[in-house]
């Protein structure tokens, strides 16, 4: 006869199942389980008296040579991804995800997709949430410690430019020229995350751009501090089309070389990644935001203006002055800073993210943004928009799955697609690098419990090393074995251009990390942005800066209180 238990009993043992909902941190968002891959009564769990034992859920005879035998199983996890909210086991082998389904011993269990053998380790995720490692595509490489801070927030990939604490790096996400690109590729060998570097996109001589792509740059950054002229942008796009790389644009705030319409005329119908499309981080005053309506523009915005709060405007004036090397004694520099900080367009930014008009969220690290707050601020925006705008179509009480899928795509799959790395990272799918973040639901979006990088635990909350148990205080983030010895290079990827990859940049520089080429970029359009592909008509009133979507004014109220804030940072 079958054994019956209550829903609460089941959840306490194996985690939530179909129809159950999980609150994300202290937000107003609830994820509801859409599917459970487990066979009820045959769940694989680890521990004393549990089922993952020899001859039970662990197969006693198979070896690692069997393709279905996992090196690592993350058991009974709630997977939140751009296309699913499911309960499943995750099978990892050789550092890659090879299956999502039901783990156990097929000799005695039904519908087993992932075999647990004597060579398999277990991460118990009952009652926990698993997400793909986040991708930050607007990183100023100013300080190597950014990587560790980002990793401890759930980010596992950085894309951008810089060479350290130079003025060019502080202001622009640029690694200029072959020599700097090579040195940064070598420096990346010591970082615990995936990286890709963008070169400088300002040159009328295409050879000066091509040599950077050949050196390993995964794209070019056109930035107003170097001169974001229509000519420079057009030349950069010509090279991008030839070599299948991305162009990231920080447009012309002062409209010195033309207006938003002139920039779009130079772009024509070619795809590019528009940085901080809201305009506060830079770009055509006051209407850069209109570019998000174009089907060839892949728009992102950065976390310092997200979500809109009563402190946002005041904070930004000082940040602009410092980041862009401005002088408070020069009236024109003050005017430059003032022109970028428009509360009306900032207030519209949250709404455009919620509507799926803006497709991505990134940091703008140490150049007006915070490298460890991409994920936190993403979910704060989602909370605020549910609070102000109500549930999205298809969502209902205790089920915000559509909004959750929209927002998680903004820092996982969409950045990966935009920069040509979605074959490798960006989602929890078979065939992708096992960059996986495990969360206690109470701390979701703020403090991960552990981060798996390339199939190995890279960072985790752990206790005193002299403690009798792993939870002895002080509990804090600690480097795990994924950051030691050869694992530092064998579990992370360095992304380069296809031409650099084919010409053996890894051998030329003696790189030990997994080197992979970016690809499939130039044919992209906004329609490729998962859950964030809306292209409505956008207008900005040139006098009031008010933003209109299909003729309707949009705005949001400045928040005075947010979730995922001080109660999580008392210690």
Curated annotation (Swiss-Prot):
Keywords of this entry: Cytoplasm, Hydrolase, Metal-binding, Nickel
PROSITE patterns assigned: UREASE_1 (PS01120), UREASE_2 (PS00145), UREASE_3 (PS51368)
Swiss-Prot/TrEMBL cofactor(s): Ni cation
InterPro entries in the record: Amidohydro-rel, Metal-dep_hydrolase_composite, Metal_Hydrolase, Urease_alpha_N_dom, Urease_alpha_subunit, Urease_AS, Urease_asu, Urease_asu_c
Domain called Urease: residue spans: 133-571
Gene3D superfamilies assigned: Metal-dependent hydrolases, Urease, subunit C, domain 1
Pathway named in the protein's UniProt entry: Nitrogen metabolism; urea degradation; CO(2) and NH(3) from urea (urease route): step 1/1
Chief place of localization: cytoplasm
Binding site for substrate: 223
Active site: 324
Entry-annotated residues carrying N6-carboxylysine: 221
Residues where Ni(2+) 1 binds: 138, 140, 221, 364
Compartment(s) of residence: Cytoplasm
Post-translational modification, as annotated: Carboxylation allows a single lysine to coordinate two nickel ions.
Reactions performed catalytically: urea + 2 H2O + H(+) = hydrogencarbonate + 2 NH4(+)
The organism's place on the tree of life at top rank: Bacteria
Binding-site residues for Ni(2+) 2, renumbered to this chain: 221, 250, 276
GO biological process: urea catabolic process
Molecular function terms, GO-annotated: nickel cation binding; urease activity
EC number, as in UniProt: 3.5.1.5
Pfam families on file: Amidohydro_1, Urease_alpha
A GO CC annotation given for this chain: cytoplasm
Subunit-structure text: Heterotrimer of UreA (gamma), UreB (beta) and UreC (alpha) subunits. Three heterotrimers associate to form the active enzyme.
NCBIfam families found in the cross-reference section: PRK13207.1, urease_alph
Family: Belongs to the metallo-dependent hydrolases superfamily. Urease alpha subunit family.
Protein name: Urease subunit alpha
Annotated organism of origin: Staphylococcus aureus (strain bovine RF122 / ET3-1)
Gene responsible for this protein: ureC
